[in-house]
Amino acid sequence: MTERVQVGGLQVAKVLFDFVNNEAIPGTGVSADTFWTGAEAVINDLAPKNKALLAKRDELQAKIDGWHQARAGQAHDAVAYKAFLEEIGYLLPEAEDFQAGTQNVDDEIARMAGPQLVVPVMNARFALNASNARWGSLYDALYGTDVISEEGGAEKGKGYNKVRGDKVIAFARAFLDEAAPLESGSHVDATSYSVKNGALVVALKNGSETGLKNAGQFLAFQGDAAKPQAVLLKHNGLHFEIQIDPSSPVGQTDAAGVKDVLMEAALTTIMDCEDSVAAVDADDKVVIYRNWLGLMKGDLAEEVSKGGSTFTRTMNPDRVYTRADGSELTLHGRSLLFVRNVGHLMTNDAILDKDGNEVPEGIQDGLFTSLIAIHDLNGNTSRKNSRTGSVYIVKPKMHGPEEAAFTNELFGRVEDVLGLPRNTLKVGIMDEERRTTVNLKACIKAAKDRVVFINTGFLDRTGDEIHTSMEAGAVVRKGAMKSEKWIGAYENNNVDVGLATGLQGKAQIGKGMWAMPDLMAAMLEQKIGHPLAGANTAWVPSPTAATLHALHYHKVDVFARQAELAKRTPASVDDILTIPLAPNTNWTAEEIKNEVDNNAQGILGYVVRWIDQGVGCSKVPDINDVGLMEDRATLRISSQLLANWLRHGVISQEQVVESLKRMAVVVDRQNASDPSYRPMAPNFDDNVAFQAALELVVEGTRQPNGYTEPVLHRRRREFKAKNGL
């Protein structure tokens, strides 16, 4: 039983109450009485509104299900369907024109374009690595990944391989020639870098000296001007640093003594309380809030063991340089942090309201993450986050403008409780639910003075696409979904609406995750599509990926690209409403088996770690042993696709069970080296994780909007109770 403290009409878990009063509040200038009294009023006033919004979701879904059921066996009538969606208030009239009015936004969001990380804030090590991923070694990112081929004697090996190292150096020199070209000659032939008379001077192997074609790209240096340790350059708004140390192992092999190129990489990071964490009770929530507090105060630290030694990882300090005129230049040493709160769906028993009901978790997150961020606003931190006095909160899984307006109201109420100026709390709107996509302009308008981010999350969005049209028929296979008409229109619509509502210069227009952290050569080839599509940020799965994805923002001037895209014909809502139904379901038995096995394996690989270990985001080997980043969004697609095929008779429940059992053996094998792993086979009936996976598919049509959280939370609590955790 959870030990609770009565606070007014609220029953607060003691572990949360003690954390808030003893750790979070001191230093904020907010008294405990003021906070809890205000929190109770917010909960009492807004929890019923939250509940009503969820009822509206269910009501609309039931009407859509009924419409499709009444037309079973008939060809889909797109015109009648659209009229029906308008009639029931799902598709609303387009909002009148407006421009976003957000103020006090940090440059990383408003004026720069670059990679964005998303990490589970529940894991302090991941959180620190991401915070420090603002700057990343290009040499390490190239040497340690498949971007550099291992052919021709360039294997990674255990020690330093000079053949591979030379390929890395050649790649980096080519980057320098592209991003900071010389007036004459090439960085390939550089023999030294120095600063003379306020300019960068590059000596070449033919004995001549040259400078940058655009002298303004040189900003500053570290060390002695005649023999600098680092030279700071800027291109397309992003910084990078040529690091020089002729005595280092790599510098010894380089004609100019260059040991690395340090890239400005993850400009922003989302510290996630949502899809990448497994937090089901007060104890879990306090872990999340405590880590967020450490980030906001700048004192988060974690003991890390690597290569037989242990050290303490902390947040990096700012970077300090000397300008050409001798003055000091300081650059932000860390990624600018957002925090992603949970959406409107779930409740959490960390707090019970006056009637003994669990309080909506999104309201709790809004109150606690904002309270904690006051430490940064007050300067009660050794590692400043926002320089403009803002708190950046990503709000996921909102369905339509009413829900965006509710978030705006919640944030206003939280500001009042905490004594913050209006619109201090900024909002990032995840465009990952269909009703938000088709009404995106109205959603942005509902938070037009807070919006700092819109982002397409195609994974969740696909899950909602399947669930919304669950009764329409069998959908295409998962691999075919990306080439369906709706998805291209959805991605373009996000950019079109963002530009039309004046987000450029005020907010990020973002794109989704590269989910294969080991396949960096493919990422380097393909993910340039995101900046070309007009996104000034896109998600990457690791600091290394952030360093490599930064290269794309040197190849594409995103703000110029946005200006071009603003002139195109906007995406069509009719295209967005095109349901991804399979033209026929005459797949071969082998094709069906492969699809079921692939999804079953992905579901199990993720769910078993979620339920048994409380891991909400991990690299899960797929059926071909390719590591894929999985979180609840990928789980939503896989479970909804199988539920859809089950609903329409493409597969049977027996096939699902048989595949899950077979794939459980595969997942057990893939996790055999993990000493804390508990095998699912052969005791399937008594294995909580296996039963959770089965329930997600078999009961998939009945899950609210296809979300996986209700099953996962209940089953994780069951596992914790069963094992005394």
Curated annotation (Swiss-Prot):
State the disulfide connectivity: none
Q: Which domain of life is it from?
A: Bacteria
Cited InterPro entries: Malate_synth_C_sf, Malate_synth_sf, Malate_synthase_TIM, Malate_synthG, MS_C, MS_N, MS_N_TIM-barrel_dom, MSG_insertion
Instruction: Give the CC-aspect GO terms.
Output: cytosol
Active-site feature positions: 340, 631
Q: What is its EC number?
A: 2.3.3.9
Indicate which residues the UniProt annotation says bind glyoxylate. Answer: 340, 432, 457-460
Question: Which pathway does this polypeptide act in?
Answer: Carbohydrate metabolism; glyoxylate cycle; (S)-malate from isocitrate: step 2/2
Please indicate if the UniProt record lists Magnesium as a keyword.
yes
**One Pfam family named in its UniProt record:** MSG_insertion
Please state the protein's primary subcellular location.
cytoplasm
A GO MF term: malate synthase activity
What is catalyzed by this enzyme? glyoxylate + acetyl-CoA + H2O = (S)-malate + CoA + H(+)
Alphabetic keyword roster: Cytoplasm, Glyoxylate bypass, Magnesium, Metal-binding, Oxidation, Transferase, Tricarboxylic acid cycle
Quote the CDD domains the UniProt record gives.
malate_synt_G (cd00728)
Where is the protein situated, by its record's location annotation? Answer: Cytoplasm
In which residues is Mg(2+) bound?
A: 432, 460
Q: Which residue positions does Cysteine sulfenic acid (-SOH) occur at?
A: 617
> Which amino acids does the record list as binding acetyl-CoA?
118, 125-126, 276, 313, 541
Q: What does the entry give for GO biological process?
A: glyoxylate catabolic process; glyoxylate cycle; tricarboxylic acid cycle
Keyword Metal-binding in record: yes
Question: Could you give the subunit structure recorded for this chain?
Answer: Monomer.
Q: What does this protein do?
A: Involved in the glycolate utilization. Catalyzes the condensation and subsequent hydrolysis of acetyl-coenzyme A (acetyl-CoA) and glyoxylate to form malate and CoA.
The family classification in the record reads: Belongs to the malate synthase family. GlcB subfamily.
| Protein name per the record | Malate synthase G
Q: What organism does the UniProt record list as the source?
A: Pseudomonas aeruginosa (strain ATCC 15692 / DSM 22644 / CIP 104116 / JCM 14847 / LMG 12228 / 1C / PRS 101 / PAO1)
